[in-house]
């Protein structure tokens, strides 16, 4: 008889505890109903990037002095710099400069240590392509100014 009463007592205590936990979860859910949505509808809304955002690297061909500091400070030796030494003026002449963004870790060391500021980080983060070889940008692609998506009339800013 006492065994039945103890089991009934334990059952009622566990039922009350379960109902209390369900009630607590329901209260948390009700508290979040009035909050605004965090999700951004990506193609139609874009996030405003911060001032120090590290996006695609912009390269200015005319400012580069071919010092190769960017290659030395890169943790993965990523920038490929091709140059010729011109005997008549005794200077290096830049032939080709390329960065593979499929491998780049966007650390920003190349931008930080460049003595002539020919490298800069842009706010462009949409680098998705179907073929990974298209992420190898040469000096022409790196010199292209980034497209500001907020100038598009169909895109709204997400705050």
Swiss-Prot record:
UniProt record, GO biological process: photosynthesis, light reaction
Catalytic activity: a plastoquinone + NADH + (n+1) H(+)(in) = a plastoquinol + NAD(+) + n H(+)(out); a plastoquinone + NADPH + (n+1) H(+)(in) = a plastoquinol + NADP(+) + n H(+)(out)
Localisation per UniProt entry: Plastid, Chloroplast thylakoid membrane
InterPro entries: 4Fe4S_Fe-S-bd (IPR017896), 4Fe4S_Fe_S_CS (IPR017900), NADH_quinone_OxRdtase_chainI (IPR010226), NDHI (IPR004497)
Entry superkingdom: Eukaryota
Keyword Nucleus found: no
Membrane topology type: Peripheral membrane protein
Main subcellular location of this protein, as a coarse class: plastid
Record's cofactor remark: Binds 2 [4Fe-4S] clusters per subunit.
Molecular function per GO: 4 iron, 4 sulfur cluster binding; iron ion binding; NADH dehydrogenase (ubiquinone) activity; quinone binding
Enzyme class: translocase
Keyword flag NADP: yes
Requisite cofactors: [4Fe-4S] cluster
GO cellular component entries: chloroplast thylakoid membrane
EC number: 7.1.1.-
UniProt record similarity statement: Belongs to the complex I 23 kDa subunit family.
Function: NDH shuttles electrons from NAD(P)H:plastoquinone, via FMN and iron-sulfur (Fe-S) centers, to quinones in the photosynthetic chain and possibly in a chloroplast respiratory chain. The immediate electron acceptor for the enzyme in this species is believed to be plastoquinone. Couples the redox reaction to proton translocation, and thus conserves the redox energy in a proton gradient.
Protein known as: NAD(P)H-quinone oxidoreductase subunit I, chloroplastic
Organism of origin: Chara vulgaris
